[in-house]
């Protein structure tokens, strides 16, 4: 019975069959299949394909509503002659961690996910996997795990590993009910015109976590100003929270999730017509997916193994990343996957795609172009999801259409795809935006970084920040920033305490005096600090950089920062640039500079900046420099001079001490990953 002809130690050895048979029996029973144990034995000993069905745990938001589809997939694998194994492979939800110590663990959970699933596949000997989900950390981590296992199989001349990814369903969006809207009428009459407009704009959007968070932030500001009492505030928050607490509001239906779906699909491993789904796939669709996987396993189609598809489609994925809006997380994910297949690809290489590939996908809840609306159009035949995007890019030869997918080459697929109609997907001739807003940066504090301009900052507003001197507001670690964000005007007060009257006056003089527009500017030369501060704030002339050091991958795992939810009476994104060696949220609506290399812990110049330092920003040439005042204006500080500041060593020592507060099992990984430039990938520490 234990034949050696399959060259499979799980078959030739005695123990595996006795362990695996009851596992498969239980998996089938839970899926509603009354399997015969003898048939499980026969399939296992005859080398039938072993296919893992990988999904998130019960506490994983994108997994909501997927249980029945997972059971049907298990039934289809069994019905088509395979052996199904259910694998729960979850990743923590980053949305839950904002503002907490858990922020530090979100990105590297991707790496732990990779290690866990890769070892799982190697130990259990799976031939293929069907992965359900849409969380970028879980899906990218799982994809790299499958790549690593595939390459390991190929090195020992075993069967390649195959995979398909099935993104989570897009739930129905919910808008605020009329009854709940009416509860806000008494408060609405007490708000100023700007806040009324903000509230109306929020109520026109689908109720999702970030919308509820913005409503709560507005109510918090009103409470601080005593416009609303605590009891009334609690009732209003409860009414909106009920609208937002639905499956259609989770991360599976977020604007970011559409980018994740499209980039994952661009690798050719998402089945056709399943990249944007409102309804669960039917049994015929699932059966076709399973049959294709089993065919690839039995024929050993090395060209469509998971590692091969990733290698063939990596440059296509970079083009789709730019075309769908340039989500900053994928700068790290694409380099992480490139590292897995042994391909050299840096963040700078990916960002160059933005010079050639315009943004052609328009997803914006505020404008009515929601993810759910696009899913409705897709279901009604208005677009073909990733196939429409690939067809549009292929028209200008921005992708390699000869690259393979599990369902044939892109050239074959796009022949049947719908053309861009300008509702969600635009033509490259008339793109939604000429660029996705990502720029490579450098300066005396770093060798490389990435600037991102939110869509609302790409049409003229950028001139308010470009070629201006900004006053630094320095934080060592995200914990200090979170404390100030929770305090009314805490961030601005931090600058106000440190900045001098001369700093305010001369930065205003250099930034605005020559661009006064109509009429002569007021004479500020005799004004005191308090009067200058009030004038600059009220006229939106203050320019600052919120610098958060110690958020890099080696210092704290590269947490994701955002300024949207703060207690400031002045919108920070309208006057501040966010700078960090960590990550910045996709929802950030201002200008940000992130992924700074080298990070502060590694001796980067970011560790030496002080609050009230002058930083000159030149987005046109991709530069930002710490400068000092001179009689003729300012001069750029030398990189060595900046790094030699005494603050630098003290802060590095403090960051080393803070690392001891992280979880021990997490802390050991920090020294074993690369910098942000290489995707925070596994690396051997060399002495």
Model-assigned labels for residue ranges:
Residues 87, 132-133, 164, 579:
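Structural motif
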Residues 112-126, 607-619:
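Extended, charge-rich low-complexity interaction segments
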Residues 87-124:
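N-terminal small/polar loop signature for handling phosphorylated ligands or for N-terminal nucleophile
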Residues 158-160, 575-577:
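Proline-centered loop/turn at the N-terminus of a beta-strand
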Residues 75, 92-97, 375, 383:
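Glycine-rich nucleotide/cofactor/substrate-binding loop typically near the N-terminus or early
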Residues 1-59, 80-82, 88, 102, ...:
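Catalytic or ion-coupling anion/metal-binding cores of large enzyme and transporter domains
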Residues 65-87:
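Low-complexity, highly charged intrinsically disordered N-terminal segments
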Residues 53, 124-142, 163:
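A short, small-residue-rich loop immediately preceding and capping a beta-strand
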